[in-house]
Amino acid sequence: MLKSIRAALAVSVITLTALGASSAFAQPLKVVASFTIIGDFAKNVGGDRIDLTTIVGPDGDAHVYEPSPADAVAMAKADIVLVNGLHFEGFLQRLVDASATKASIAVLTKGVTPINFKPEFAEADAAEGAETDGGKTVTDPHAFQSIANAKIYVKNIADAFCTADAAGCDSYKANAAAYTQKLDALEGEVQAAIQSIPQEKRVVITSHDAFGYFEKAYGLTFLAPEGVSTESEPSAADVAKLVSQIKQDKAAAIFVENITNPRLIEQIASETGIKVGGTLYSDALSQPDGPASTYIDLMHNNIAQIKGAILGS
């Protein structure tokens, strides 16, 4: 892959040289977002002042993504790269090195209070490169699943854009404030939806443990056969243990995720007798014509699927 990336970069070097330093931001700010959720935040903050490229596209899995030569070219041309951090993007450092980008890299989880991943899969996830605190505790990188954290991402994006393009700062701040108001309203909707579900029914199953921040923020319990990363499947013993826990906790619904193979969830559904309730969007947005093409639509879809499967509506 490195040879093809370097070849693609060589083709773009003349363009980069021609751009030079003159009128650095007379043209839109060149922004690279690591995956679609961050890309959506960037669009809402940047508007028409940015030229956005998103690395991991709709329904893509950033845990296992392999970057392309085109990704390296985009990185090399970028003014700003927006990333999640907390080891969410396993491909990131390789892509930075291969592209030799000089872009500013904004880590959007700056200011977020990280939570630790559930201990069942901590050892396996640590072996796969997830961030640890020195022991087997693993930091959950899916901070965007809390709307309160999404607001932090948005603020960090606005700050990064203001630093790179001072002339557009008022616009970025106004856009961020307007979008944050929409997130405030969204959070109220999610809280109301969860409150309508009886406490004893607030247990659901998903493919991998991507919803820890949602669980902590809104009081819904998620059980998952896979850990914080999708890089490896759980063992038969892990699945058997989860099936036992599902029966013990009387889980009310089970869901596939848009980024994972549904086979394992279908197996668990068969063994527990719980009907698959639909698809939740975890680490990526849907295609533009899908039900979760924006972050707000993602949250609307997920809460509607969860509430509908549990309450039968």
Describe the function of each predicted region.
Residues M1-S12:
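Bacterial N-terminal signal peptides that target proteins for export
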Residues S12-T15, A304:
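N-terminal non-cleavable signal-anchor helices
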Residues L2, A24-F25:
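Short, aromatic- and cysteine-enriched interfacial helices/patches
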Residues T15-A24:
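C-terminal segment of classical bacterial N-terminal signal peptides
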